[in-house]
């Protein structure tokens, strides 16, 4: 991630109303900042944790600062979901994602049906792939998980990916793990069983799933479903 104006260190006091957080900056001043994360931020919103803020020079903004990262469990965690798609798009174009090697074009916010869009359409190796991206900031016992709250919208996106595969298209669900204390990924069945079951169905139908960490060097993570270390479901 590129923060051309640098980041401001602070300490989290509380996160509330979904999009707001109170923090204490270095001189002891308490300010309210924008928190662009629609989830619960489970495992990454503990009071008194160190945080990093970016600052905007847009005079129309009510809150100049944005919460970008929080330090918990000995790692920095990216919580600004507004950056997720850009991180993945840049990684694809610079060749960091092996599955999309040779990518020549990345289109964003692709309409696939009335009232429904997916994040990316990638041209690579004489083919096109539709990609829906999910930011993952939650981890427990070294396993990253998504979602951290019930997500009807996320389930809808999986349905759209299934439709595309049935039409002969390539479709991917891409989980970006914005923390480095995880060795694998799995759906958070205990939080949203419908999403988890729909993800399993999507993989059975041919949707491909990827989980990558946002770190200095991106590396693939195994996806755990029903105790299997394969991204595909075990045969019944």
UniProtKB/Swiss-Prot annotation:
InterPro entries: SfsA, SfsA_C, SfsA_N. One of its GO terms (molecular function) is DNA binding. Gene3D superfamilies: 2.40.50.580, 3.40.1350.60. Belongs to the SfsA family. This is Sugar fermentation stimulation protein homolog. It comes from Desulfotalea psychrophila (strain LSv54 / DSM 12343). The lineage of its organism: Bacteria, Pseudomonadati, Thermodesulfobacteriota, Desulfobulbia, Desulfobulbales.
């Amino acid at each position: 991630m590129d923060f051309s104006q640098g980041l401001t260190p602070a300490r989290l006091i509380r996160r509330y109303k979904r999009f707001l957080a109170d923090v204490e900056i270095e001189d002891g001043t308490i300010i309210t900042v924008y928190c662009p994360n629609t989830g619960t931020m489970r495992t990454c919103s503990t009071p008194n944790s160190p945080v990093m803020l970016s600052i905007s020079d847009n005079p129309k903004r009510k809150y100049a600062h944005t919460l970008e990262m929080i330090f918990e469990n000995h790692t920095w965690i990216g919580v600004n979901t507004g950056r997720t798609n850009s991180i993945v798009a840049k990684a694809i174009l610079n060749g960091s994602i092996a599955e999309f090697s040779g990518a020549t074009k990345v289109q964003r916010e692709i309409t696939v049906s009335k009232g429904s869009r997916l994040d990316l359409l990638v041209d690579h190796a004489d083919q096109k792939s539709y990609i829906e991206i999910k930011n993952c900031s939650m981890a427990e016992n070294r396993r990253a998980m998504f979602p951290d709250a019930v997500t009807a919208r996320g389930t809808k996106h999986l349905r759209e990916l299934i439709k595309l595969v049935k039409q002969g298209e390539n479709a991917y669900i891409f989980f970006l793990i914005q923390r480095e204390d995880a060795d694998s990924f799995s759906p958070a069945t205990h939080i949203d069983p419908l999403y988890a079951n729909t993800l399993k169905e999507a993989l059975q139908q041919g949707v491909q799933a990827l989980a990558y960490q946002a770190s200095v060097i991106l590396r693939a993570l195994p996806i755990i479903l029903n105790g299997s270390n394969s991204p595909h479901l075990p045969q019944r």
